[in-house]
Amino acid sequence: MNRLSVVGTSRRGRRGRTLAALLIAVSSACAPAAPTYDLLLTGGTVIDGTGAARRVADVAIRGDRIADIGASLPRRGAARVVDVSGQIVSPGFWDNHAHLVTLADHGLAENFVRQGITTVLAPLHSQDQPFPMDQYRARVKMAPNVGLFAGHTWIRKRVMGLADRAPTAAELAWMRALVDSAMTQGALGLSTGLEYVPATYAKVDEVASLAEVASPYGGIYVTHLRDEGPAVMDALRETLEVGRRARIPVQVNHLKVTGAAQWGWSTRMLALLDSARAAGMEVAADVYPYTAYSTYSDLMFPPWALADGAPAFAKRVADPATRARLVQEMRVRFPQQAGAEPSSIQFREVSFDASLAGKTLADYLVATGQPVTLEAAVEALIALQLRGGFIGIFHGMDEADVARFLTHPGTMVETDGDLVTFGRGFPHPRSYGSFPRVLAHHVRERQQLTLEAAVQRMTALPAQWLGIRDRGTLAVGQRADITVFNAGQIADRATYTAPHQWPEGIQLVAVNGTVVFENGRMTGALPGMFLTRGRGAR
C-alpha cells in the first residue's frame, strides 16, 4: 500500500467516526428522556404528619423516596400523574400492634392495607414466632412494611413449656440467649403478653432480666399488661418497674381498662403514665377505637386453674373442692373482665361448633335450656373450656375511657387485628376498621381530635418513637409510604355482627413508592420491607 492510500484511508476513517458520533448525538437527543418522577400526585391537600396545618401541594415520587413537594410541580416527564384534588395526602398509617401469624401465606395483608396502613408492628407476644427470624425476613414478601419483636411467650414455652414457676438459672440464661438471638436478627425489642398462659407465670424479675438483653441494642419493651381489669394499676406499675430496672423505653399495647366494675379508671391510669414521663422515663401507649376486646376464653379463668395445660385443668375441675373454689373466683372475675351480663361475651371461634360464631354466651345458655344467669354462665364457661375453649369478643369497655385514652397527648393508634381472609371466620371489626373509625368517629363526627393531630398519632409519632427517621412524615428524601383518603367519606363499615366489610374513603396507598392499593383494588405488588431498629445502642 502506498503512502497516499494510507493517508486517504485515514481521512475517510476520521470522517466515518465523526459521522457516527453525530448520529449517536442526534439519536440520543431524539430518545425519550428518563422520567422526572415515577409518580406525581397532583392537587391534593397535604397533611405531612408533623402536626402542621394542611396545605394544597403536589407530591412527587422517584423510586422509593419522595422527590419533591410543592405547588404545581411539572407534569411533563412524570411517568404517571394521578389527580388527587379534594383528597388528603398523608404519610402511610402505622399499626402499632397487630397479629400477622399467617403473613408468609398472605403477604398482601389486605385488611390492613385497605385501612391505609403501610407499616405493621407485630409483637409476637401471644403466638409462636418465626425462628430463625433472619431466615423468615429473607423469605417473606409482603405489601406493607413490618416490624418484629422477640416474643416472650414463645421464648418461655420453648424453654419451660407451660410450667407455673420461676425459671432456674440455666433456664433464664437460655431465655436471655434467645432474646439476644432475636435482637441480632432484627427484632425491635422485647414483647410480652403477661395476661396469657404461660407468660402470666413470669414475675417482674424474669421480665426485667430479658428486657435488659434488648436494651443495649436500642430495643424497646412493649407489653400486653398482666391485667387490664381490677389489677390494671398494679400491672402498669409493674411495666414501669421493668423499664426502670432494664433502662429501656416501655410501650403499653392497646391501653384500656376492661370490666364494668373498673369503668372510669382511665383518668388514674393516664396520670400514672404522665408521672413516669415527668420523672424522665420514656413511656408510650397505643389504643384501638372500640369498646370490645378480643382474646381467648382463658382470660375468664384465674391463672392457677390453667397451669400445666388441659389435662391438669380437667383434673382440677373433677375435684369437688377445687371446682368449688374455681366457681367462686370466676363469679367475681366475670364482671371484672367482661360486662355485667352473659350477653357481653360473644363467640368468635369455637373449634368444636362453628355455628356459635357471632352468637353470645346468653344465646348459648338459652339454646341449651339454661337460665341466663351469672351462675349458669360460669358453669357454661367451664364446660366450654373442657372442650378446648374459644376465642371471643368481650364487650367490657366504656366509650368514655376509650376516647380519653385515644385523645391523650402522645397516644398512638393500633388495630390489635388479625390477618384475615375476606368472608372467612368471624373476626373482631377492628381487623377491618380501626384507622378509618378514628378518622370518622373521633375526628369528623365527635371532633375529639383535629385531622392533623390524628394523622400525627398514626404516622410521625410511632416512627419517632422507634427512632426511624426516614419514615412517618411527608418530606423530600423520606420513604414514599403514602395514604390518600377522602376526609369527608372515610368510614369503617365492619360491625360486631357483620365484620367482613371493607372501609370506605381510601383512594390510594403506596409503600416504598409502589402503589399497593388504588380505587378499590389491590395491585398485587409486594414492596414492603422489614423495619430495622432506629434507636441507637445504649
Give the location of each predicted region.
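Bacterial N-terminal signal peptides that target proteins for export
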Residues: 2-19
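C-terminal cap of metal-dependent C-N hydrolases
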Residues: 44, 404-410, 415-416, 483-529
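Acidic, glycine-enriched loop/beta-strand segments at the rims
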Residues: 38, 46-58, 389-402, 446-455, ...
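Divalent metal-binding pocket/active-site signature
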Residues: 181-239
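Histidine-rich, glycine-flanked metal-binding segment
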Residues: 34-40, 46-90, 492
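Divalent-metal coordination cores built from histidine and acidic residues
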Residues: 83-100, 104-192, 211-218, 277, ...
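Active-site neighborhoods of metal-dependent hydrolases
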Residues: 148-150, 158-169, 173-197, 211, ...
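Bacterial N-terminal signal peptides
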Residues: 18-29
